């Protein structure tokens, strides 16, 4: 069985909210190369403004650490509420999200 990755999502830092653009970061540990990362905003898939990078393979278990960064204009960020990062791997997926109004 494939191990599920550990996924964390980080909302924009308060200092960023004073600038023109904000970033949301999704980090996955124990990530296998065949996995996929998708972003949703208010339940709708998002495909722009995303930059994903992997660290070198861990020789112990053949997994990677993955970082996916979503960059948005502040006005766009403020006009939506729920931000979701989904890491799918094998038969399972891990979803992390946050609501802007709860931050």
UniProtKB/Swiss-Prot annotation:
SMART domains: IGc1 (SM00407). Pfam families: C1-set (PF07654). Signal peptide: none annotated. Keywords: Disulfide bond, Immunoglobulin domain. Residues 5-99 form the Ig-like domain. The keyword Disulfide bond applies. The keyword Ion transport does not apply. Disulfide bonds join 26-85. InterPro entries: Ig-like_dom (IPR007110), Ig-like_dom_sf (IPR036179), Ig-like_fold (IPR013783), Ig_C1-set (IPR003597), Immune_Resp_Modulators (IPR050380). This is Ig kappa-b5 chain C region. It comes from Oryctolagus cuniculus.
């Amino acid at each position: 069985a494939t191990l599920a990755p550990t996924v964390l999502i980080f909302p924009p830092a308060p200092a960023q909210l004073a600038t023109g653009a904000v970033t949301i970061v999704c980090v996955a540990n124990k990530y296998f190369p065949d996995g996929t990362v998708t972003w949703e905003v208010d339940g709708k898939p998002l495909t722009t403004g995303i930059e994903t990078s992997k660290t070198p393979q861990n020789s112990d278990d053949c997994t990677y650490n993955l970082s996916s960064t979503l960059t948005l204009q502040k006005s766009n960020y403020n006009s939506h509420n729920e931000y979701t990062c989904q890491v799918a791997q094998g038969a399972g997926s891990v979803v992390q999200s946050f609501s802007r109004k709860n931050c």
